[in-house]
Structures are given as C-alpha cells and as structure tokens.
Swiss-Prot record:
Family according to the record: Belongs to the asfivirus MGF 360 family.
Disulphide bridges, residue numbers: none
Swiss-Prot/TrEMBL GO biological process terms: taxis
Coiled-coil intervals: none
Descriptive protein name: Protein MGF 360-6L
InterPro entries for the chain: ASFV_MGF360
Domain of life of the organism encoding this protein: Viruses
The protein's role, per its UniProt record: Plays a role in virus cell tropism, and may be required for efficient virus replication in macrophages.
C-alpha cells in the first residue's frame, strides 16, 4: 500500500508543481526526495519518461520509467521506488539490482517475483534484446557483479555469442575481456547495429574511452550515420585504410566499404586485404559465403584493380582461387560509373548505394556457379 506521502508526491510531480522553483528551494526538494539529477523531478505520462529540472523527454540524460526504477533501487530511494511502480515500472527489473536485503524485501512487497533471480534472468536478457532496451540492460547488468556471477560461465558466453561471436573474432579478443566489459560492448554494439541514436549518444558520453571502438564498430557494421557523426562532429579519427580492413570483414558491407573509400582508403589495398581474409577464414565452398565475395565485387566496382602484381601473386598460390580468377577476367567485373564520386553525407551515400544496386548489371553468382561447373 502506498503512503499518503508517496501519493502526494505523485500528484505534485504530475501537476508540475516545481517547474518554477527557486534555487533556494533545491536543498528542501532534495531532502523531500523530489529531486532528480540536476533539478526537480518530472514525469511525462505520454512518454513514460522521468526528467530533472528543465530536461525534456528527448534529452540524452532523460530516463525511461524502468531505468528510473533501477536507479532508485540502486540508491535505496524507497519513496521513489514506490512512486515509479505506481506509475507502471516493472518491479522485477528492480529486484535484480537491489543491493540491500531491505530494498529486496520492498521490491517483493511491491510485486516482484522472489524466484525471478533464479529463473528469470535469461528470459529477461532475451526480452531486452527483442525490445531493444539497450540502456536499461546496461543499467541492470553493468557493474552488477552478483548478477553477472550468477550466470554459469559457459551459458553466459553462449548467450553473448548468440549475436556477438563473429564480431569478437574480428574486433576484440574475447579471452581478455571481463564479463562486465563484454556485457557493455555487447549492448553498445547492439545500439550501433540498429542505429539507436539516444543510447549511442548516452554511452558515448559515459564511456569516452570506447570512442575509437565505437567508430570501428560503426565501420564494421556499415552504420554511415554514426561514422559521419563520430568522424566529423566528434573528431574521432582512425586511419581510413584500417577502417576499410574492418569494413571488408562484414558480409555485404557496401555502405561501410564505400564510406571508407570516400574518406580516402586505398581501394586496391582493400581488395588485397579481402583476398587475404578469404584465404585465412574461408575454407568452405565458394557460394557458402556470398556476402564476403560480394565485397570483392563491390571493391572492383569502386575501381580496385584485380590485375595488380600482389593480387596475381596471391591468386597463383592456391588452386581454390580458380573461381576468383574466372571472376577477374576482363568484362566480368569492372568499375561502376555511379560510384566514382566520393560523397560523405549519409543520406546521399544511401542513395548512391541504392542506385548502384538497382542498376548493377553483374551476372548473378548462381549463374556463375553453373558456368564454372
């Protein structure tokens, strides 16, 4: 049951009673539990967002209701916990973050499932993925050692690898990453992959030591909006050729490859790196990895020369390159005129790639397979 004090706070906050507060009132508001971050607490019923002071719902630092609950639980703010649950926050998110037995008991009294810590953690992780709740997931798992340790080590890595494994192989060394860092990078990568702008901005502000990693991730996943933002608005810079080597590793990454090319990466070097990557990684039939081979085709469409001495030397070493030798015959692969311009505006880049894909006249790989037999 909610106390009169909690109900009174609810009414005052919903009616924006403190929107024009005086600075001298800040101490009193803090003591009464009516303060959030840098100002009087506010709540938007429509957006289900908790704000502080003049903060708007769209601000990077605003909190969705479940995140606000997690923060209140971590800080043992009893009245705010009750208030957020009254507004509709999911109390099970709170119980997994409770640091004291008293707060855990309060969560149970407010409706949390006592068995959730034993049976609900995996389902919660998957649900957060489905709902794309990146910041909520990081609030719950990051620095929550007791929760991370409750995962069986094998099961934990199986769960993370479900989405993250190939990425780790190409960008991180998993054996050197703690569970804590792995969880953070898992969700950070997820935000970049789906271009979730608010989580990306929030995490960029909170974890500046990962700025280079963020740019690499954006390149690897072909998120040209984030590459542009990091490169030109935040001045995060890496060698374009190194960025290109990352872009080439991700299947069918036309956006990432083109953007690195537009930034000045050497397209012949990119093709050489791709062929070496194929030699190292792919010992399977040609058509089982169409995505990587399509990157080869795209590099040539951008003007890469498959007849350089280095590339020809690589091709001569292995019989498995017979099909690639066929692809490199004159007339079969050639530069595409629409890709000659180097454009850096993300929306224009997407238009160019879309037009390229529409006007592409290259024979389908399936027909080539028939010709090779």
């Amino acid at each position: 049951m909610n106390s009169l004090q909690v109900l009174t706070k609810k009414v005052l906050i919903e009616n924006k009673a403190f929107s024009n507060y005086h600075e001298d009132d800040s101490f009193i508001l803090q003591q009464l539990g009516l303060w959030w971050e840098n100002g009087p607490i506010g709540f938007c019923k429509q957006c289900k967002m908790v704000t502080g002071g003049s903060m708007s719902c769209s601000d990077v630092d605003s909190y969705e209701l479940d995140r606000a609950l997690v923060k209140a639980v971590k800080e043992n703010q009893t009245d705010l916990i009750k208030l957020f649950v009254l507004w509709g926050a999911e109390i099970n998110f709170g119980i997994v973050c409770a640091k004291t037995e008293r707060t855990k008991v309060l969560c149970i009294q407010l409706g949390a499932d006592p068995k959730f810590l034993d049976v609900g953690l995996y389902n919660m992780f998957v649900d957060l993925i489905k709902q794309q709740k990146v910041l909520l997931a990081i609030d719950i798992y990051y620095d929550n050692i007791s929760i991370l340790d409750s995962f069986d080590s094998h099961d934990f890595y199986v769960l993370i690898d479900f989405i993250y494994n190939g990425f780790i192989l190409n960008l991180d060394e998993k054996e050197k990453i703690t569970k804590n860092t792995l969880v953070l990078k898992f969700w950070y990568k997820f935000a970049i992959e789906f271009n979730l702008v608010k989580p990306i901005r929030f995490l960029g502000k909170k974890f500046p030591h990962l700025d280079d990693w963020r740019l690499k991730t954006a390149v690897y996943l072909g998120n040209v909006d984030e590459i542009h933002h990091a490169y030109f608005q935040e001045n995060i810079r890496l060698d374009p050729n190194h960025m290109m080597s990352l872009a080439c590793m991700y299947p069918q990454n036309k956006l990432g490859i083109y953007y690195c090319f537009a930034l000045g990466a050497n397209i012949n070097t990119a093709l050489e790196a791709l062929i070496r990557f194929i030699n190292h990684e792919l010992n399977r039939p040609f058509f089982s990895n169409y995505g990587i081979w399509s990157n080869v085709h795209f590099c040539i469409s951008l003007g890469a020369n498959p007849y350089t001495k280095k590339i020809q030397e690589i091709l001569l070493r292995e019989e498995k390159y017979d099909i690639m030798k066929l692809l490199f015959k004159k007339g079969l692969l050639s530069p595409h005129s629409i890709l000659h311009k180097k454009i850096l505006e993300p929306s224009e880049v997407r238009k160019i790639i879309s037009t390229y894909q529409y006007t592409e006249t290259f024979h389908s790989f399936s027909s080539l397979r028939d010709n090779v037999r």
